[in-house]
């Protein structure tokens, strides 16, 4: 049974909703342009240990935006129902790549970077398997939940099959190690299952079982404990653990109303690590000011609103569920990133969709947008509007 805010009957006859998909495409384009500008400003004076200069980050991101934009356009014009056939291969490929980064003999294509093995170098492109897994889990969960229908309310034949597949994927992401992405993938699967009608009681049981596991995962690494202490008790946390969050707040505060100007921020000069990715919202706050922060919030808020409107009136159950999941993929990721930047959440390393540097993240966000638009266009085919 679907939750009441999802309209199972779909849109009414002759309802022209083309403005929603057009506005969604426009929002994605604006966010990408905003992101390219922000990445350039955040990395303009950066030189990496490997000799890369900051402008290379913006150029690489721009190339990713072009490729992702082309793919999103093609997906927007395709039939989203085909993704049901691709769900199993996608989850299989994602799981395979997640295993590849953990194998002891694959360091050549999956090197250790910043203490973790999270990327696979395929020669012409470097891929982050957990980003692919994020998208694949949403599509796969939506596919299977749509097939199960009312059986989703049972545990053995409903929820258990999802756990058998999703739990190992989440576990592989955790082993990279990437706890924040593992939790995000679990949350996205939960959103789709909840929307499909899974019992709240089952989620409560999973919460009781999962809470000790989450505590154990945090306790398994000193840096995770430090991050949680920074959030819960900043005064008792090590100084190096509070540094990032403190500098993030300093940068946002320094921006005041209109910001210090594009490329003029000081926090990126060694004070705030990963100002172009993990903390790009802070860079926007410093260089674009309160006005820039509000613009970002409005853009993401409108994107999520449109995504749920598309989901509510999708032509079939799979379309409804995949639209909810992909909207949550963008919305939850943005909320986590912004929450960390404002010290409202422990540091996670979750990127800001469309904006943070990272071509895997950008590609997934654009692909998600393309599929969302496809769901929106599918409604018009269903209700007879050309």
Where do the PLM segments sit?
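Hydrophobic transmembrane alpha-helices and their immediate junctions
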Residues: 291-334
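Hydrophobic alpha-helical segments of polytopic membrane proteins
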Residues: 88-89, 93-95, 156-175, 179-219, ...
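Hydrophobic, glycine- and aromatic-enriched re-entrant/interface helices and adjoining loop segments
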Residues: 110-119, 123, 202-296, 314-322
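Juxtamembrane membrane-interface segments at transmembrane alpha-helix termini
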Residues: 97-110, 194-204, 214-224, 333-339
């Amino acid at each position: 049974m679907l939750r009441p805010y999802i309209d199972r009957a779909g849109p009414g006859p002759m309802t022209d909703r083309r403005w929603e998909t057009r506005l969604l495409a426009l929002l994605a384009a604006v966010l990408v342009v905003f992101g390219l500008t922000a990445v350039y400003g955040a990395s303009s004076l950066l030189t990496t240990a490997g000799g890369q200069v900051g402008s290379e980050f913006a150029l690489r991101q721009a190339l990713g935006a072009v490729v992702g934009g082309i793919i999103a356009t093609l997906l927007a014009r395709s039939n989203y129902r085909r993704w049901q056939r691709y769900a199993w291969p996608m989850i299989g490929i994602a799981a395979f790549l997640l295993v590849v980064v953990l194998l002891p003999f694959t360091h050549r294509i999956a090197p250790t970077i910043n203490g973790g093995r999270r990327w696979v170098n395929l020669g012409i492109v470097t891929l982050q398997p957990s980003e692919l897994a994020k998208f694949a889990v949403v599509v796969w969960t939506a596919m299977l939940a749509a097939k199960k229908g009312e059986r989703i309310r049972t545990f053995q034949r409903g929820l258990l099959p999802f756990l058998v597949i999703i739990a190992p994927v989440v576990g592989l992401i955790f082993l990279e190690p990437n706890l924040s992405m593992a939790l995000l993938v679990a949350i996205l699967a939960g959103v789709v299952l909840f929307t499909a009608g899974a019992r709240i009681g089952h989620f409560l049981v999973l919460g009781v079982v999962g809470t000790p596991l989450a505590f154990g995962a945090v306790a398994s690494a000193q840096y995770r404990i430090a991050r949680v202490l920074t959030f819960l008790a900043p005064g008792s946390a090590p100084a190096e653990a509070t540094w990032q969050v403190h500098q993030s707040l300093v940068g946002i505060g320094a921006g005041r109303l209109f910001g210090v100007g594009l490329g003029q921020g000081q926090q990126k000069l060694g004070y705030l690590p990963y100002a172009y990715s993990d903390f790009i919202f802070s860079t926007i706050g410093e260089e674009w000011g309160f006005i820039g922060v509000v613009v970002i919030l409005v853009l993401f808020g409108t994107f999520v609103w449109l995504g749920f409107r598309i989901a509510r009136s999708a032509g079939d159950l799979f379309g409804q569920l995949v639209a909810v999941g992909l909207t949550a993929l963008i919305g939850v990721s943005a909320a986590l990133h912004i929450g960390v930047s404002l010290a409202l959440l422990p540091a996670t390393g979750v990127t800001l969709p469309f904006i943070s540097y990272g071509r895997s993240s950008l590609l997934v966000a654009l692909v998600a947008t393309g599929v969302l638009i496809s769901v929106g266009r599918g409604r018009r085919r269903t209700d007879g509007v050309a």
